[in-house]
Regions:
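Short, electropositive alpha-helical surface patch
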Residues: 21-28, 119, 238-251
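A structural motif corresponding to the C-terminal end of an alpha-helix
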Residues: 1-3, 41-46, 89-104, 137-143, ...
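Glycoside hydrolase catalytic-domain groove-lining segments
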Residues: 76, 87, 139-239, 250-254
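Conserved small/polar residues in nucleotide/adenosyl-binding loops
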Residues: 256-265
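Substrate-binding cleft and catalytic face of glycoside hydrolase catalytic domains
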Residues: 1-93, 102-116
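Flexible loop residues that form catalytic
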Residues: 54, 111, 149-150, 266
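A general structural detector for well-ordered alpha-helical segments in enzyme core domains, enriched
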Residues: 34, 38, 86-89, 93, ...
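Substrate-binding cleft/loops of secretory-pathway carbohydrate-active enzymes
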Residues: 108-141
């Protein structure tokens, strides 16, 4: 068993929360100090370090979407500030970890879903970038990528969404307040699912092949990095369904590592 240390998994200390949480301009320094303190105590035999778990998720649900994670602000400007501080914290921590352990391999674990093909969907492009791609940009200097995927993101086939989203995204003063509500109404994971769509107990569309989609995606972007599947699974109380899901995921992993071309789908 190879241990992997995770320094941050959603929980923010109350003292930092009371000082503005990730909106605090010193939050990245505070996080780096915390990492340095732990590195002084951790044995050198530990090699793998994950600085932040799913940075896009806790930034999005805490600062852009409504009423999911604390502080539940739902303001685009603050979401961008928090995201920048989170990415800065990761980059500083990466350097600090390597100063204490020259053999360290450092990365982040990213929540990456399969995205429904719809290149004309402006909201899809906006969310995919701010939830996933910009945090992948912050991983350019990382040693490994942690992949955490569960489902596909779909969108309602709404004419209103097509018409008004581009307009909304160009109205700077209004959008920072209205955009979170629009996202909440139109862009949930359930998107365009029908009553016949197979789902898990979490309400996610049953999508074990989403792993293969993201393995290809990551390999295309980071061909020389280690890629670990650090989270995956299904919420179910049916063991047969669980076995089916896990078996399909493993088959997709074998397909990914086979000699056949890996990037044709992306």
């Amino acid at each position: 068993i190879t241990p992997v240390i995770t320094f941050h998994h959603f929980t923010t200390p109350e003292w930092l929360y009371n000082q503005g949480s990730w909106l605090n301009p010193k939050s990245d320094e505070y996080f780096n100090n915390y990492v340095a303190k732990l590195m002084k105590e951790l044995p050198k035999e530990i090699v793998y370090f994950n600085t932040i778990n799913e940075p896009g998720i806790f930034a999005y649900f805490g600062y852009l979407s409504t009423n999911k994670f604390p502080p539940g602000i739902a303001n685009e400007t603050k979401f961008i500030i928090a995201s920048e501080n989170i990415m800065s914290a990761h980059k500083k921590a990466l350097k600090t970890i390597k100063e204490y352990n020259s053999n360290a391999k450092v990365g982040m674990t990213h929540a990456l879903q399969e995205w429904e093909d719809d290149d004309d969907n402006k909201l899809k492009k906006y969310l995919k970038y701010h939830l996933e791609d910009k945090f992948l940009e912050a991983s350019e200097d990382d040693d490994f990528i942690g992949l955490q995927t569960y489902t596909i993101v779909r969108y309602p086939k709404s004419i209103l969404l097509k018409l008004f989203t581009p307009l909304l995204l160009n109205i700077g003063v209004i959008r920072k307040f209205i955009l979170p509500r629009i996202i909440q109404i139109f862009a949930g994971r359930n998107g365009a699912m029908t009553k016949d769509t197979r789902t898990t107990k979490m309400g996610y569309e049953y999508r074990p092949d989403a792993v293969l989609y993201n393995l290809k995606r990551l390999n295309k972007r980071f061909p020389n990095k280690e890629i670990f599947i650090t989270e995956n699974g299904i919420a179910t109380d049916n063991d047969d369904e669980r076995i089916e899901f896990v078996t399909t995921v493993l088959k997709n992993c074998l397909l990914y590592t086979s000699p056949s071309p890996r990037d044709e789908a992306l």
